[in-house]
Amino acid sequence: MLCSVIQRQTREVSNTMSLDSYYLGFDLSTQQLKCLAINQDLKIVHSETVEFEKDLPHYHTKKGVYIHGDTIECPVAMWLEALDLVLSKYREAKFPLNKVMAVSGSCQQHGSVYWSSQAESLLEQLNKKPEKDLLHYVSSVAFARQTAPNWQDHSTAKQCQEFEECIGGPEKMAQLTGSRAHFRFTGPQILKIAQLEPEAYEKTKTISLVSNFLTSILVGHLVELEEADACGMNLYDIRERKFSDELLHLIDSSSKDKTIRQKLMRAPMKNLIAGTICKYFIEKYGFNTNCKVSPMTGDNLATICSLPLRKNDVLVSLGTSTTVLLVTDKYHPSPNYHLFIHPTLPNHYMGMICYCNGSLARERIRDELNKERENNYEKTNDWTLFNQAVLDDSESSENELGVYFPLGEIVPSVKAINKRVIFNPKTGMIEREVAKFKDKRHDAKNIVESQALSCRVRISPLLSDSNASSQQRLNEDTIVKFDYDESPLRDYLNKRPERTFFVGGASKNDAIVKKFAQVIGATKGNFRLETPNSCALGGCYKAMWSLLYDSNKIAVPFDKFLNDNFPWHVMESISDVDNENWDRYNSKIVPLSELEKTLI
């Protein structure tokens, strides 16, 4: 039934477009530029990639960047050359670029490009018949700096402190901009350049993020910042939807040049379409003369556009680290996570929570279990014992809790520590710390449960009331504190996501995913899929919907469009809704709060 409905809806969308129409999604990441193509049925039909270190070795980057101590940057010219190269690959493959109706994409977040006063006139050359490559027209004189800070840069501790002092601390910074001040965020990076490179800063007429840099190249003129990506700058007042006067003044006060607002082109764009692709790409590569460019956005923002995520849906990426993305209509910021304006849903936000200790912490427990098994010392990558322990309910661990942080953790913000405790299930209070549990196998279950429970309690303030309730006898008036949030336990007992989507390497592990699903407690299903192209694919979907919506061919919002037309056959439905197990973990919320208090 579901398949027939989806097929009918897909045909309806297909009927609004010409046959054999295509949509491109770029992914300009740190190490490569990928370009993905889908057809009108949302099927991936072609892909090309340029790996910077391998395909453009003359830039002498290491994994796409230059590293000088804490300063990590990328050569901007390399991106221009990569764009020509990836489109040349499409041309060589005889892909019909003349049937591409729209393009969009994803770019590494936070990086900044510093255009000179000559940039606009040089970009105008892209609207004439091309005779040479991009680097000839958009030459080095187009830029006041030849490199762009990369998100891995951590040289701005001083500037982050100045930012937070300007606003009144990390909590007020998060309230204003959606995040506390971070090394990689664009505002502190701009401030550093204004302070340490005054000549380059004064030569800068316009500052772009990587996203609107690429959009500008494609349309042949400078375009404003894309609003969702601008939320990763520590400069944008999200509630007021404008740049913060105080933070712009901080940058202006550090330079003779008092024009930061003008450099940022005054305000981000809110348009679905930035313009038509410029003549350079039409003449050189055969693009359709009416091909539209939807503004590029940031990589994490494009990721949520690659899946049919609606309000109260959660995406859990289980990799070396754990990242949780969710769609919410609640603006509830915290210094320990990030909030961005949603790139395609008005009046919605993307929440992002990043944990440092993910797979590596679990692997340590796995290895310890394997070393105890006879003749298995060499098979430390075998998950059999670990998985059996995670799913084994024969031995109760209901009064046990542990945190396993072999590395310093981001959420909560603490140094490396492992700690195991026994708690009173009736009160939730910690009774004692223990060096080990009665069975080492309990560590496997407890590490997965505590990781999942941390995700659950931290997404709770961003979820709508789901009318959930606990069957356990708990004191719902107990005040629970996680990070900067302090509220009664009842506030954590009536919030559940609708759907949870699992991606990443560890999502292939059935035991880990099942336990995460039990703890998080989605009410309308749990799903798993592989997403090697998520950023570029999100760009494809954004391009397609933006064109159709802007041209009045469809009237549905992005989330409904993607839910109706998503290729659900690539998605695996896993782990049925489990109300009983979700309720079981309610008794561990207070103990987790109490345990985290002892870590600070």
UniProtKB/Swiss-Prot annotation:
Transmembrane regions listed in the UniProt entry: none
GO biological process per UniProt: D-xylose metabolic process; xylulose catabolic process; xylulose metabolic process
Pfam families for this protein: FGGY_C, FGGY_N
Record keywords, A-Z: ATP-binding, Carbohydrate metabolism, Cytoplasm, Kinase, Nucleotide-binding, Phosphoprotein, Transferase, Xylose metabolism
Annotated residues for binding of substrate: 79-82, 299
Classification via SUPFAM superfamilies: Actin-like ATPase domain
InterPro entries: ATPase_NBD, D-XK_euk, FGGY_C, FGGY_N
Record-listed E.C. numbers: 2.7.1.17
Cellular location(s): Cytoplasm
Note: Present with 3460 molecules/cell in log phase SD medium.
PANTHER family reported in the protein's UniProt record: SUGAR KINASE, XYLULOSE KINASE
Protein name as it appears in the record: Xylulose kinase
Organism from which the protein derives: Saccharomyces cerevisiae (strain ATCC 204508 / S288c)
Gene from which this protein is expressed: XKS1
